[in-house]
């Protein structure tokens, strides 16, 4: 008893949602596949490709830590801000310090800030 494609489509059109759900589960079990897998794989691959192509990064101060005065000094050195502005920036984290910088510069500045106890993110 061979079914052609039109008969299969007609049967699927007449089926209830519960019957279609059972059909999908049976197909997944029979062939060892899942219906959601292609979506997750495609999304993951696109995100990975975007991360590799990124050439500009943002340096974000997430927190000052316990040595706030040292962090303020380094922030002033990095940004060229005055004492008052640097203190306000450090007190109101998370805040971007530099935007659109090269990865090497971002990593150097991150290391400098972490050295004095700040928590920093590179995005």
UniProtKB/Swiss-Prot annotation:
One of the protein's GO biological processes: translation
Entry keyword set: Ribonucleoprotein, Ribosomal protein
Any GO CC annotation of this UniProt entry: cytosolic large ribosomal subunit
Domain of life, source organism: Bacteria
Pfam families, sorted: Ribosomal_L12, Ribosomal_L12_N
Alphabetized InterPro entries for the sequence: Ribosomal_bL12 (IPR000206), Ribosomal_bL12_C (IPR013823), Ribosomal_bL12_C/ClpS-like (IPR014719), Ribosomal_bL12_oligo (IPR008932), Ribosomal_bL12_oligo_N_sf (IPR036235)
GO molecular function, one term: mRNA binding
Function: Forms part of the ribosomal stalk which helps the ribosome interact with GTP-bound translation factors. Is thus essential for accurate translation.
Subunit: Homodimer. Part of the 50S ribosomal subunit; present in 4 copies per ribosome. Forms part of the ribosomal stalk which helps the ribosome interact with GTP-bound translation factors. Forms a pentameric L10(L12)2(L12)2 complex, where L10 forms an elongated spine to which 2 L12 dimers bind in a sequential fashion.
UniProt record similarity statement: Belongs to the bacterial ribosomal protein bL12 family.
Protein name: Large ribosomal subunit protein bL12
Species for this entry: Bacillus subtilis (strain 168)
């Amino acid at each position: 008893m061979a079914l052609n494609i039109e008969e299969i489509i007609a049967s699927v059109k007449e089926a209830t949602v519960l019957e279609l759900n059972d059909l999908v589960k049976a197909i997944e079990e029979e062939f060892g596949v899942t219906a959601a897998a292609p979506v997750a794989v495609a999304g993951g691959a696109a995100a990975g490709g975007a991360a590799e192509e990124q050439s500009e990064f943002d340096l974000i101060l997430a927190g000052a830590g316990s040595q706030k005065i040292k962090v303020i000094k380094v922030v002033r050195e990095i940004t060229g801000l005055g004492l008052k502005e640097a203190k306000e920036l450090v007190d109101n984290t998370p805040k971007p310090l530099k935007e659109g910088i090269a990865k090497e510069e971002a990593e150097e500045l991150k290391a400098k800030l972490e050295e004095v106890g700040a928590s920093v993110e590179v995005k």
